Amino acid sequence: MKYIGAHVSAAGGVENAPKNAGLIGATAFALFTKNQRQWKAKTLTEKSILGFKEACRTLGYGPGQILAHDSYLINLGHPDRESLEKSRAAFVDEMERCQQLGISLLNFHPGSHLGRIDIDPCLATIAASINLALEQTQDVTAVIENTAGQGTNLGFDFSQIRTIIDQVEDKTRVGVCLDTCHSFSAGYDLKSEHGFHQTFETFDRVIGFDYLKGMHLNDSTKAMGSRVDRHASLGQGTLGMAPFERIMKDTRFDNIPLILETPDPSLWASEIQQLRAFL
């Protein structure tokens, strides 16, 4: 089964996210459980929590079809101790919010060294941050998203993600979300048929499909290897539609949330239909 959806708005309360997903014919969805550009947020009310769970039940969204996304402000590899502790506390809060809502997957960007520490110590700090969060929470998997490698962001190379996973103590609660735009911008060829198969052979060898918990399906405005993160609507960028057809026809991508983060929400319903037509 292919679970296809988009990162929908939770404006007015998290309980609105499942409804917004239903309106575009989605069988999966992503959401922010709080304002993604603020450190602090009001605690979730009992009304919102019950409303979210009831909407998911009514519309048929199980935990494996929902991929929460954490705040953009969080940097679990921050070289400054005070800023790191602030990020770690915010990440635990994000995990706890997922726990309250019955969401089992929290997607996050691994972190950045900011040009102030070497890569390996930064990766170790990210892993330590994950360990601390997992110790303080339960039932939620920390899902590392690969990045485009823009600026000093880490996680653009599969081996960097593997290094983080190797240092996470509870391997049952860590996973990976692959973003097609990020992968392509980081230099992984998803466009050609040979490159597509080679990329996922590499992913399986270095990380392993057992860790794949979700995907972001985005075209890219930039060339392969550009290390620039700019999403495009499906078929309107440098990737084209072929990679997305391959993903739809490949059973390795079954039973995980496949989430659009394409820039035009008015196209999401038709993009979902396009993807379904490949099945």
UniProtKB/Swiss-Prot annotation:
One of its GO terms (molecular function) is deoxyribonuclease IV (phage-T4-induced) activity. Keywords: DNA damage, DNA repair, Endonuclease, Hydrolase, Metal-binding, Nuclease, Zinc. Its cofactor is Zn(2+). Gene3D superfamilies: Divalent-metal-dependent TIM barrel enzymes (3.20.20.150). One of its GO terms (biological process) is base-excision repair. Zn(2+) 3 binds at H182, D229, H231. Binds 3 Zn(2+) ions. Its EC number is 3.1.21.2. InterPro entries: AP_endonuc_2, AP_endonuc_F2_Zn_BS, Xyl_isomerase-like_sf, Xyl_isomerase-like_TIM-brl. It catalyses: Endonucleolytic cleavage to 5'-phosphooligonucleotide end-products. PANTHER family: APURINIC-APYRIMIDINIC ENDONUCLEASE, ENDONUCLEASE IV ENDODEOXYRIBONUCLEASE IV. This is Probable endonuclease 4. The lineage of its organism: Bacteria, Pseudomonadati, Thermodesulfobacteriota, Desulfobacteria, Desulfobacterales.
